[in-house]
Regions:
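Conserved alpha/beta-hydrolase "acid-adjacent" motif
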Residues: 204-210
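Short beta-strand/loop motif that positions the catalytic acidic residue
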Residues: 191, 197-199, 203
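Flexible "cap/lid" loop of the alpha/beta hydrolase fold
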Residues: 101-128
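Gly/Ala-rich beta-loop-alpha elbow adjacent to hydrolase catalytic centers
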Residues: 79-83, 87
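Catalytic active-site module of serine/aspartate enzymes centered on a nucleophile-bearing elbow/loop
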Residues: 222, 228-284
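The serine-hydrolase catalytic nucleophile loop
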Residues: 14-24
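Conserved alpha/beta-hydrolase
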Residues: 30-46
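Alpha/beta-hydrolase
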Residues: 140-187
Length: 284
């Protein structure tokens, strides 16, 4: 055992570590060890997701968790978007008792304000052989970002085909997420580790219904609602608040949520960063 505190971070669907913004840096500044797993089918090309099942994601994070729990007296888990579903299922599977759990924008329900009315039709398509492998679900505006400056940068990254996030995912992969959403609803009442739920009021992908469900269903959970972000809360306007809440919940000093350079800028009256004059390098 190292005597240090470890944190396992899990990114979202089609994403990378950038889904979590600069949270890993805040954890390290605070004295923790941040470990970011790359889920199977990610970090390469979207086509590689087509043959990956949800079980592979859970097996991968379980293996990582088992390796880390041998190193740390305290081990926390945090997940963003789909990664939050994986994180909850992991903690349920291993009966996580070595630390706490943070669920960031968990999509238990796909019912946000930007989701199309015909979203439920995908369940019919799931029954048609071969269709889900060929159909693509494209990323598009607003990219989970309320801040217009950051959103414009994200749009440029997609246009340049940067590797920070897949531009699309196969519909068959959405089916795997739907499977996990059902598992989460069943597992939540028996996932007993202390849990923090962070969710944006204006999340365009998944409404506050998801957060309220988790808060009510889980035995030891509390929810904090963010008022100035869309879905990608680790990179949007509330990113510093997210880092503060997570650090404090995990027992770290929340003062480390912002970098020393940003802290000096704020001390000089440089503003809160809401207009993103300095976009964090963890922008998704």
């Amino acid at each position: 055992m190292t005597g240090r505190t470890g944190v396992l971070l899990i990114h979202g669907l089609g994403g990378t570590e950038y889904d979590l913004g600069s949270l890993h840096k805040a954890i390290r500044r605070a004295g923790g060890d941040a470990h970011i797993i790359t889920l199977p089918g990610h970090g390469t090309r979207p086509e590689d997701l087509a043959k990956v099942h949800a079980e592979a994601w859970l097996d991968a994070v379980t293996a990582q968790y088992r390796a880390l729990e041998a190193e740390y007296d305290t081990l926390h888990v945090a997940g963003m978007c789909m990664g939050a579903l994986v994180a909850l299922l992991l903690c349920h599977r291993v009966q996580h008792a070595k630390g706490r759990l943070a669920l960031l924008a968990a999509p238990v329900y796909i019912d946000g304000w930007s989701t199309p009315w015909y979203r439920a039709l995908r369940y019919l398509l799931y029954q048609v052989p071969g269709v889900t492998e060929r159909m693509r679900v494209e990323e598009g505006e607003p990219f989970g970002i309320k801040n217009p400056v950051i959103r414009a940068l994200v749009k440029k990254k997609f246009a340049r085909q940067d590797s920070f996030h897949y531009p699309w995912v196969p519909l068959v992969t959405i089916r795997q997420v739907d499977r996990m959403r059902g598992w989460v609803r069943a597992a939540a009442p028996d996932t007993r580790c202390p849990t923090l739920i962070l969710h944006a009021r204006e999340d365009e992908l998944t409404s506050l219904r998801s957060a309220r469900f988790l808060e009510a269903a889980m035995p030891d959970a509390r929810c904090i609602v963010l008022d100035n972000s869309y879905h990608m809360i680790c990179a949007d306007n509330d990113r510093d608040a997210v880092a503060r809440h997570v650090l404090e919940f995990f027992g770290f000093d929340p003062a480390h949520a912002v970098s020393p350079a940003m802290a000096r800028r704020l001390a000089r009256g440089g503003g809160s960063g809401e207009a993103a004059p300095d976009v964090p390098d963890g922008t998704p």
